[in-house]
């Protein structure tokens, strides 16, 4: 069941759904707008000949921060990681779904490639997979509304929520844009 603005405010007021910093003006009829933080991870195209999800490639990305007050410029065809300004803490009976903003999508900005689902129990900043599919550069301003988070109530609380020892929670507690950790549980078929 998708939560309404009333349900979202009730979950936040009760302390079950944590959002820091929280701004009530960001609550929409059935979602919460999320804002862009000021840190980005850009890919180092000269360090590796290819990306291998089975290997730890520590120098695949570099953390960058625009000069105070300046935007990050995302060029056509580029892909970078960003993150939400807000830190989210989900209870064991709520899951999240990150969606883009329609106005930004109409400019050619994709907010996530595939990872729009947030498990119950997750706590941290949400990493954004930002792509420019337009034919002009797009300026990304820290603090701008970048997406919206919908919350879904589970039919029962999760038995092993994200962050529990059985969940394999490699991104629990992440701060800022976090690079892939696919190598940690990569399985090769024989």
Curated annotation (Swiss-Prot):
Enzymatic reactions: dCTP + 2 H2O = dUMP + NH4(+) + diphosphate
Protein name: dCTP deaminase, dUMP-forming
Positions of region (Disordered): 160-190
Function of the protein: Bifunctional enzyme that catalyzes both the deamination of dCTP to dUTP and the hydrolysis of dUTP to dUMP without releasing the toxic dUTP intermediate. It also acts as a dUTP diphosphatase. Affinity for dCTP and dUTP are very similar.
Site (Important for bifunctional activity): 116-117
Pathway(s) where this gene product acts: Pyrimidine metabolism; dUMP biosynthesis; dUMP from dCTP: step 1/1
Pfam families: DCD
GO molecular function list: dCTP deaminase (dUMP-forming) activity; dCTP deaminase activity; dUTP diphosphatase activity; nucleotide binding
Record-level GO BP terms: dUMP biosynthetic process; dUTP biosynthetic process; nucleobase-containing small molecule interconversion
Organism: Mycobacterium tuberculosis (strain ATCC 25618 / H37Rv)
Gene3D superfamilies membership: 2.70.40.10
Keywords: Hydrolase, Nucleotide metabolism, Nucleotide-binding
Subunit architecture: Homotrimer.
Regulation: dTTP inhibits both the combined reaction and the dUTPase reaction.
Listed EC numbers: 3.5.4.30
Residues reported in the UniProt entry to bind dCTP: 101-106, 119, 127-129, 148, 162, 170, 174
Active-site positions on this chain: 129 (proton donor/acceptor)
Extent of Polar residues compositional bias: 171-190
Family to which this protein belongs: Belongs to the dCTP deaminase family.
